[in-house]
Amino acid sequence: MISSAQQDVIIDVLSKHKPRMVGIFGSYARGENDEDSDLDILVDFEESLDLLELIGLEQELTENLGIKVDLITVHSLSPQLKHYVEKDLIPIAT
């Protein structure tokens, strides 16, 4: 799980782009993370961001959190993975 300070950093970084929902999934959500784990974040933005903006946000989150971040948008989530993501998903902002 992530700390409330880490949640604040995530929300602060992503708030510039008006997210409708932000959640974590994967090993951090299940409490199975270790020092090699990345932090999987699912986000639904009000407006579409281009690839460079998403990469920039991912890098900013990685730098500010000190954890490798994978930023996934709701619209880019494949139908095959949707079930697994939703099963683990812990919303941190709506």
What are these regions (language model features)?
Residues 26, 40:
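Conserved G/P- and acidic residue-centered "switch" motifs that form tight phosphate/ATP-binding loops
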Residues 42-44:
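Short hydrophobic/aromatic beta-strand micro-patches
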